[in-house]
């Protein structure tokens, strides 16, 4: 159906443990599943196939084509270390709770997992709260808006996801 390295456009319809969006593609009598890192329900995304198996594929997010209806606009700039920054905290909580409960139910075989669940423990503040921050300096700046790389620049910020040499400059709050 697909091959490794192919770029596809899919609509994410559910969420899996570990921050992966799930897209289902009709394949005869069954469905072919595509797991897309850092995508969530309601988004239409462009993704590159990394791993191809018989019943499923794993893909890396390239671009969000259509945002989900629940996404909100914030004053914060996008950074690769916070892919769910634009998802309201109550939606994040719901996704994480259902993912956790379904994982424990599937592994344990116990179907009434909700009766054992005490609840979601929230962070003191949804924003401006981090357990740890690690900033990097680099002479290679990744420009977030255009996707370009600027060599010979001075950049202070977060490392671009999947790289150790590129930094996304922090120029907004």
Residue positions per predicted region:
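Accessory RNA-recognition modules of RNA-modification enzymes
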Residues: 1-173
């Amino acid at each position: 159906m697909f091959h490794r390295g192919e770029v596809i456009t899919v609509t994410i319809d559910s969420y899996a443990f570990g921050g992966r969006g799930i897209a289902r593609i009709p394949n005869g009598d069954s469905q072919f599943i595509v797991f897309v890192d850092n995508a969530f329900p309601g988004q239409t995304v462009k993704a590159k196939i990394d791993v191809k198996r018989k019943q499923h594929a794993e893909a890396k997010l390239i671009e969000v084509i259509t945002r989900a209806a629940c996404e909100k606009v914030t004053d914060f700039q996008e950074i690769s270390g916070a892919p769910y920054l634009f998802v309201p905290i109550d939606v994040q909580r719901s996704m994480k709770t259902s993912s956790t409960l379904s994982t424990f139910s599937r592994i344990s075989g116990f179907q009434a997992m909700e009766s054992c669940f005490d609840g979601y423990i929230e962070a003191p503040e949804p924003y401006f709260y981090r357990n740890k921050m690690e900033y990097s300096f680099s002479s290679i700046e990744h420009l977030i808006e255009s996707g370009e790389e600027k060599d010979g620049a001075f950049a202070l910020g977060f490392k671009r996801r999947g790289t150790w040499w590129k930094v996304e400059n922090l120029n907004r709050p």
